[in-house]
C-alpha cells in the first residue's frame, strides 16, 4: 500500500471518516472516489459484524479500509485485523511502552505475537500465500499498517521513540484531542500546536514513516499538505450528508420563494 491516490499517483491519497455504518454508505464513499475510508470504531456504534460489512464494502470497490479501533487491547486490535482491515489507527496512545505492546499484538512472528486463524484476512484459509506461513506473515506485517495516534502529551513526549519502532507504519495526529491536551482546544493556530505538528512530521520523515492528520475543510487540508503531512483525512460521512441536504433544501426554498421554477436544481 502506498499513500498516493489509486488512480492519480502524482497526488496524495484522499480519505474521510465513516460514522454512518452499513455496507451501502461505505460503497457510496468508495464510489465517490475516496482512496481510503476510516471506519470509526472508537466513536461509532459498531459491532464487529457491522465493521466487517463496512470493510468488505469498501474493498469491493478498490477503496482501502482503515479502522480506528476502540482500544489498544489485544482483542480490539486482532479482531479488526482478522476481518481484513487494511490499516489500524489506534487512539489515545500514551507512551512508547504502550506502542510496543500494540506492535506485539498486531504483527506476526518474528516482529510480534499476533495470533493466527483462518479468518477473512487470509481468505478463510484459502489464501495462496498460506502455502508458506513465513511468507504470509512477512506480507501481512508489511502490508497491514499500524498507525498510533498522537493526541496525548505522553505520546507527543515519546513521539521520536514511537516512530522509530519497527512495526509502526505511521502516526495519525489527532488535532482536536492534542490541542486540548496542549491547553487550547481546537486552536490549531497556536505556536505550541504548530511546533507539535512539525515535530510529528519531522519524526515521521526521519524514519520513513507516514504522517496523517484530520482536516475539517478543504482549506485546512491544503494547509496541512503544505505543512508536510503525507495523508489528510477530510471530514466525515455524516457531515457530507448533512451539508448536502442543507444545500439542496436552501436552494429549493430560494427557488420556490423567487419564482417557483425548479428546473435549475442539480
Model-derived features with residue positions:
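N-terminal amphipathic alpha-helix/helix-capping segment at the start of soluble metabolic enzymes
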Residues: 1-17, 128-143, 198-206, 253, ...
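Conserved N-terminal beta1-alpha1 strand-loop-helix module at the mouth
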Residues: 1-72, 104, 146, 164-168
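Glycine-rich phosphate-binding active-site loops on the catalytic face of alpha/beta enzymes
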Residues: 87-101, 171-180, 229-248
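Conserved anion-binding
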Residues: 75, 87-166, 256, 260-266
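Catalytic cores of alpha/beta
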Residues: 27, 31, 72-86, 90, ...
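Glycine-rich tight-turn/loop motif centered on a GG-T
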Residues: 85-87, 107-120, 181-195, 235-237
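Alpha-helix-loop-beta-strand connector modules within alpha/beta enzyme cores
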Residues: 3, 48-82, 104-112, 138-141, ...
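Catalytic beta/alpha-barrel core
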Residues: 17-18, 37-46, 65-71, 86-94, ...
